[in-house]
Amino acid sequence: MKETIVAQATAPGRGGIGILRVSGPLATKVAQAILGKCPKPRMADYLPFKDADGTILDQGIALYFKSPNSFTGEDVLELQGHGGQVVLDLLLKRILQIDGIRLARPGEFSEQAFLNDKLDLAQAEAIADLIDATSEQAVRSALKSLQGEFSKKVNELVDSVIYLRTYVEASIDFPDEEIDFLADGKIEANLRGIINQLEDVRSEAKQGSILREGMKVVIAGRPNAGKSSLLNALAGREAAIVTDIAGTTRDVLREHIHIDGMPLHIIDTAGLRDAIDEVERIGISRAWTEIEQADRIILMLDSSDPESADLSKVRSEFLAKLPSTLPVTIVRNKIDLNGEQASESEQGGYQMISLSAQTHDGVQLLREHLKQAMGFQTGMEGGFLARRRHLDALDKAAEHLQIGLVQLTEFHAGELLAEELRLVQSYLSEITGQFTSDDLLGNIFSSFCIGK
């Protein structure tokens, strides 16, 4: 017999309304014990919530959803009372006294919904993403995922792969036919079509990943180059202390901002130089750690100081120490001191923005550059949120499609192509949970809120 679980569905703390959710075959037993009756399915009933001795603990709305017409696909009882934490704890304690009832694990209600085919894995993850959304655009995209937009695109890809895989395996199973199915062009055309179809989904998923997770941008450079001033300009507030004293910033400062809906984690770091004391040395060490973990570096140069703005010196002192794959944007700051105009150009293979963090002249140029460099498109009509595991699965599927194309066009190897298509199908199915390990499911749902 399946277990019956209970948890508080509203956030802990004081509030106007507090909700307890019960799911499982004993939900009606809980209703009888607490309410004295089971409400009619999908009908709100205003009733007292009673303790074991008949004492009224609270009173409020009771809702009963009969299996399979509920969020979890099981019998569900919701008790909506007053939001005082003590009241909710007393009611929860009473329910847990009933034989066969236990406290739900984090995300267990959503896990039950997934296991009972009420929603797939991508939709279940969208619930957590909707709760954690930090912008209006993220909310809209999470709702798209919850409504099955992402899953629909993935399932269409899976259907295309299954069709092609069936065709390829049929050509292998009937080698005596006069028609050479592998050479008639149909398989290659279909395969290239799937590759293009997958690229479209990958592009949208990358947008969705940026929207969900944000991008980590580290501001680095010599002391007194204006790094903290730029952080304040981008954040729109005095987030960092700014003085004319070199080395004012000793530790890492973090700000979460949005540029036209694109979330960015902006990180201000200590000035990079030979440290003059132990505290500054620790700050510089932390700065390099942040730099190594960044999605993009903003390298600040002081345009009023010819020596510090010398690109050849910057290349040897700083750029040569970075991983070759790490994107860098060079910012020439303090143009207000020499009368320059804000501009964007390319020098030495790097995009260069000339601006004044003090007057904010050119800061909007940097904002637009970051948005473009990150590949973010404002609006994202019809977009969906995506997680890192989704991108990994799509990337692996794309890799095996390309391998399959080589097996077909260069080696005429139908058996090897069929195996690559099987792997593609497996990776895509991981996204929606059709083929997913129990360990992965545990990791995903354990990150959810209790009561979700």
Swiss-Prot record:
Key words of the record: Cytoplasm, GTP-binding, Hydrolase, Magnesium, Metal-binding, Nucleotide-binding, Potassium, tRNA processing
Keyword Ribonucleoprotein attached: no
Residues holding (6S)-5-formyl-5,6,7,8-tetrahydrofolate: 21, 78, 118, 452
Keyword Isomerase part of the UniProt annotation: no
Family matches, as InterPro entries: G_TrmE, GTP-bd, GTP-bd_TrmE_N, GTPase_MnmE, MnmE_dom2, MnmE_helical, P-loop_NTPase, Small_GTP-bd
Subcellular location: Cytoplasm
Protein family membership: Belongs to the TRAFAC class TrmE-Era-EngA-EngB-Septin-like GTPase superfamily. TrmE GTPase family.
General function of this protein: Exhibits a very high intrinsic GTPase hydrolysis rate. Involved in the addition of a carboxymethylaminomethyl (cmnm) group at the wobble position (U34) of certain tRNAs, forming tRNA-cmnm(5)s(2)U34.
Protein name per Swiss-Prot or TrEMBL: tRNA modification GTPase MnmE
Organism: Haemophilus influenzae (strain ATCC 51907 / DSM 11121 / KW20 / Rd)
Gene name linked to the record: mnmE
